[in-house]
Design a protein with these regions (language model features):
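Conserved thiamine diphosphate
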Residues: 123-150
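A short beta-strand-to-alpha-helix junction
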Residues: 117-121
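Conserved beta-strand scaffold positions in the cores of enzyme catalytic domains, especially
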Residues: 102, 136-138, 166
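Hydrophobic/aromatic ligand-binding patch that stacks against planar heteroaromatic rings
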Residues: 92, 128, 157
């Protein structure tokens, strides 16, 4: 008694995933957030594989109808090998999805590295995206209008060039 039936439990809701159809001025859009345990970037190849499967299933040969968006923390983007593996495979025939939009948040919780000189060997966490020549847009997350502008630029870039881009 006193419990909500079907209520989600746990402290991090994105662990459970989410899926919904949203009405937009351009029509209905399906949005899916894959379940993601606290193993940070391990969801990246899962999302990319899911997108590729959906594209193949609906005959989306130009890779424009299903678009992967990955959210990253700054320390995990530059520090976890699964990111580099996903980037490396992104341009191959079997794994190509027409480009992924990567959004990196400097969440300042790369807590195992208190000294910036222990965090990485590059100036920016986004430098690993140079391996596929992905453009990088740096934006101040405290300026919501500029963040929206950066997302618009990234979306247009992905639509025109069918390649990864990083914000």
């Amino acid at each position: 008694e006193g419990e909500l039936e079907g209520a989600n439990t746990g402290d991090v809701k994105y662990h459970l995933g989410f899926s919904s159809n949203l009405d937009t001025p351009g029509g209905e859009v399906h949005v899916s957030l894959n379940s993601n345990p606290s193993h940070l970037e391990i969801v990246d190849p899962v999302v990319i594989g899911s997108v590729r499967a959906r594209q193949d299933r609906i005959g989306d040969e130009d890779r424009s109808k299903v678009i992967p968006v990955l959210l990253h923390g700054d320390a995990s983007f530059s520090g976890q090998g699964v990111v580099m593996e996903s980037l490396q495979m992104s341009q191959t025939r079997g794994f190509y999805v027409g480009g992924t939009i990567h959004i990196i948040v400097n969440n300042q919780i790369g807590f195992t590295t208190s000294n910036k000189y222990d965090a990485r060997s590059t100036d920016y966490c986004t430098d690993v995206a140079k391996m596929i020549q992905a453009p990088v847009i740096h934006v101040n997350g405290d300026d919501p209008e500029m963040v929206v502008n950066a997302v618009k630029i990234a979306t247009k870039y992905r639509a025109k060039f069918n390649k990864d881009i990083v914000i």
